[in-house]
Amino acid sequence: MNYRDYLQQLIYKIINPLIHGMIKIGITPNFITTTGFILNVVAAGMFVYAGICGGQNDLSILGWAGGVILFAGLFDMMDGRVARLGNMSSKFGALYDSVLDRYSELMTFFGICYYLSVKDYFIYAIIAFVALIGSLMVSYVRARAEGLGIECKVGFMQRPERVVLTSLGALFCGVFKDITAFDPMLILMVPLTIVAVFANITAFARVRHCYKVMTANEKKND
């Protein structure tokens, strides 16, 4: 069992009572998915608001936005769990979840890029945009590969890691907004830079994985 599976099982043990309660009162996976998406839209709006109207409290707003993203990530875990335990899994539900996940990331990174641009952190905004590109490509390569019949889950920087790094970066940027030893914006940018680098590495690693699998399959068919 790798670290991701271990943490997932640990979190499931904690939230399972809540999951069973949701199933009992009739909450559907799609409702949970939609709620998580709305929370990410709220977080994106908070980044935009911090850029326009935040003033001296803008970093505090960033911190709250990070907390909202982290909370929304919990819904991202619960929808699939409710679907499985409640026997409500469906192909449309899987599609709906995947589509709203992509919209959620787009909205979140749009908010971050907007904030950084408005605050004249131009280089930081580019890094955030590169992180967005990598995040989308990780998901796209997997979806395209699975459409070709290839399982493609390799790589480190998957969605849970991206959500945790982005949300905690924003959260702690707000918590330590009054630090004077360095620009507190670095607290957000270090994890975003990690996402930017490793998400794109993961995307290319998945392309390489698909190439190896396809090449091996072609040799078998010869």
Swiss-Prot record:
MF annotations from Gene Ontology: metal ion binding; phosphotransferase activity, for other substituted phosphate groups
Primary location group: membrane
Positions with a binding annotation for Mg(2+) 2: 76, 97, 101
Reported cofactor(s): Mg(2+)
Domain of life: Bacteria
Cofactor binding mode and count: Contains a di-nuclear catalytic Mg(2+) center.
Membrane topology, record value: Multi-pass membrane protein
Cellular component, GO annotation: membrane
Residues reported to bind a CDP-1,2-diacyl-sn-glycerol: 80, 84, 90
InterPro entries reported in the protein's UniProt record: CDP-OH_P_trans, CDP-OH_PTrfase_TM_dom, CDP_ALCOHOL_P_TRANSF_CS
Pathway, per record: Phospholipid metabolism; phosphatidylinositol phosphate biosynthesis
Residues annotated as transmembrane: 32-52, 58-78, 99-117, 121-141, 163-183, 185-205
Name of the protein this chain belongs to: Phosphatidylinositol phosphate synthase
Species of the source: Bacteroides thetaiotaomicron (strain ATCC 29148 / DSM 2079 / JCM 5827 / CCUG 10774 / NCTC 10582 / VPI-5482 / E50)
